[in-house]
């Protein structure tokens, strides 16, 4: 499966086209809208979330609530477009107006300057409109479709926040993914540890008061994936590599780890690798899950556990020093409307991109065209693994 997205942050709409989604999957707009609503929540979001109420329109690939196997077109309108029709006009506008609206002061940490250099733009709005995290809206929409595939296969995905602004969750004693989801859905910062959540919100408030921003760490867990999904044969077929790329492709994400992650560098091998055990009921499994569900680029049958590091958002209300590309004079960087912390929302985006990669690998491995055949083949693999 693959998808492409199109659209600018303040353009009329965002669009994604999904290719390779198998036929026979039950898919309704409400499945996608539920995920879009989750993305818009979260402590520390900016004023734009008060303007937008994201809702999807499905324009192709679905009939009578079932996918057809043909490309699926999803569109989310930007309600704020009405205030930007002149600035973001497709047609040429008056040159004086264009000069007045030009963005010539690149923001440190953003795509502004590099994009202007690459594409030859003298107005960096041509860069920042597309590089904006607003694009993740339709990535979440794509992820919602992937989640529907996984749900049909008995695979569950859950994302949550484990750190914001140096405040780390200590309590992680949830008994199931269902409990984790129930608690984090009620948390303003999507954190299971209620005491840590309060301190996280205080850190966000402090950053906002100072015109600053803060980042954090999110974790995504996937349960129910059979062993052997992915491949050791080629670098580009390793599923953990695909998930790592997907996580780092999210706006402002700068690092990724699986299982105990970078802690593995500080431990001896005897405290890193997961011992293999066998039982008649489960077949081969692992005593621990320090590898985060992967060995050799393939799933082990244990839960996939992946974490991503999100840097603070580079748009600051107390902007850093920059240089105007026209005058070459030092100035403070441009200010765009933004969040002081988007880590809670980013956990939803991380869920979406991980779900897409896992679903895509399963569809590729177990039959690409029909959901009923994919279900049969996944169950066969589960039985085979138990009896191996």
UniProtKB/Swiss-Prot annotation:
Pfam families: Chorismate_synt. It comes from the Bacteria. FMN binds at residues 130-132, 251-252, 296, 311-315, 337. NADP(+) binds at residues 39, 45. It is an enzyme of class 4 (lyase). It catalyses: 5-O-(1-carboxyvinyl)-3-phosphoshikimate = chorismate + phosphate. This reaction introduces a second double bond into the aromatic ring system. GO terms for biological process: amino acid biosynthetic process; aromatic amino acid family biosynthetic process; chorismate biosynthetic process. Its EC number is 4.2.3.5. This is Chorismate synthase. GO terms for cellular component: cytosol. Homotetramer. GO terms for molecular function: chorismate synthase activity; FMN binding. SUPFAM superfamilies: Chorismate synthase, AroC (SSF103263). Its cofactor is FMNH2. It comes from Geobacillus sp. (strain WCH70). Keywords: Amino-acid biosynthesis, Aromatic amino acid biosynthesis, FAD, Flavoprotein, FMN, Lyase, NADP. Pathway: Metabolic intermediate biosynthesis; chorismate biosynthesis; chorismate from D-erythrose 4-phosphate and phosphoenolpyruvate: step 7/7. InterPro entries: Chorismate_synth (IPR000453), Chorismate_synth_AroC_sf (IPR035904), Chorismate_synthase_CS (IPR020541). The keyword Ribonucleoprotein does not apply. Reduced FMN (FMNH(2)). The lineage of its organism: Bacteria, Bacillati, Bacillota, Bacilli, Bacillales. PANTHER family: CHORISMATE SYNTHASE. Belongs to the chorismate synthase family. The keyword Lyase applies. The gene is aroC.
């Amino acid at each position: 499966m693959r998808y492409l997205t199109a659209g600018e942050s303040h353009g009329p709409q965002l669009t994604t086209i999904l290719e390779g989604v198998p036929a026979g999957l039950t898919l309704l707009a409400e499945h996608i809208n539920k995920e879009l609503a989750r993305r818009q929540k979260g402590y520390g979001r900016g004023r734009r979330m008060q303007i937008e109420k994201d809702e999807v329109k499905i324009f192709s690939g679905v009939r009578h609530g079932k996918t057809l196997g043909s490309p699926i077109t999803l569109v989310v309108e930007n309600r704020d477009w009405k205030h930007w029709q002149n600035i973001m006009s497709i047609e040429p506008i008056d040159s004086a107006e264009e000069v007045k609206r030009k963005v010539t002061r690149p923001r440190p940490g953003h795509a502004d300057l590099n994009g202007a250099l690459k594409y030859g733009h003298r107005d960096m709005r041509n860069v920042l409109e597309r590089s904006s995290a607003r694009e993740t809206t339709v990535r979440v929409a794509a992820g919602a479709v992937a989640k529907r595939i996984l749900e049909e296969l008995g695979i569950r995905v859950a994302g949550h926040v484990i750190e914001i602004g140096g405040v780390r969750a200590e309590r992680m004693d949830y008994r199931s993914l269902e409990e984790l989801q129930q608690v984090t859905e009620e948390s303003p910062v999507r954190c299971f540890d209620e005491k840590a959540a309060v301190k996280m919100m205080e850190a966000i408030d402090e950053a906002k008061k100072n015109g600053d921003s803060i980042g954090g760490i999110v974790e995504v867990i996937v349960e129910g994936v059979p062993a052997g999904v992915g491949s050791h044969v080629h670098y580009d077929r390793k599923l953990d590599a695909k998930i790592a790329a997907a996580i780092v492709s999210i706006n402002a994400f700068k690092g990724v780890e699986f299982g105990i992650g970078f802690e593995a560098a500080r431990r001896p091998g005897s405290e890193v690798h997961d011992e293999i055990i066998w039982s008649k009921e489960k077949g081969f499994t692992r005593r621990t899950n320090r590898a985060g569900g992967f060995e050799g680029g393939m799933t082990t049958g244990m839960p996939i556990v992946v974490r991503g590091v999100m840097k603070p958002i580079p748009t600051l209300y107390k902007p850093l020093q920059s240089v105007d590309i026209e005058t070459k004079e030092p100035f403070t960087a441009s200010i765009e409307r933004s969040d002081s912390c988007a880590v809670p929302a980013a956990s939803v985006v991380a869920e979406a991109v991980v779900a897409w990669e896992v679903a895509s690998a399963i569809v590729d491995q177990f039959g690409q065209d029909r959901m009923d055949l994919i279900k049969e083949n996944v169950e066969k693999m589960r039985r085979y693994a138990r009896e191996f």
